[in-house]
Amino acid sequence: MRRPAAVIGVFLVCCAAACTLRRQVAPPSPYCRGGNPLAGVYHPSRLRVNSRCRVAVGTVSKVAFEPYDGDVHVDLRLDRGYESLLSDGNDRVGGNLVVEVIPFDRSRVAVPSEGARIEVVGPWVEDDQHGWNEIHPAWWVSAGRIEPATTAELRAVQLLLQNNATDSG
């Protein structure tokens, strides 16, 4: 009678140990965030999260401000070894990975310069509207300037986010 109880006890200890070991796997970067990975993103339902937090390294080929949603759009030519982050749709942006810095993060996430070699950290997503993969939002960019969004930009984005929440809820 004691043998089945011992077997069950050993099984439970092994399960608990496996769960503990699984939880202790380090994230790919200390810049990964908890919570909703798409918090603050305009129209998040168009994005499918492939991974909550990924690292990408490459050279910036283009930086553009998107006035509608206030994002800073970065086209990143990936270093060798990071190509798996791309989809066929990324061919429409020159084979680059799209990286987006959202307005609420512009006070703490650097905006890189064209030609800079950078590392970025953030959720790796598929943009269903455009059909390409992105890091969106970028939670950390290794080089660039902090360019906070203006009060007017933040207000406009807040209205967009509120209207989007009303439209989808």
Q: PLM ranges: what are they?
A:
Residues 1-9:
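N-terminal Sec-pathway targeting helices
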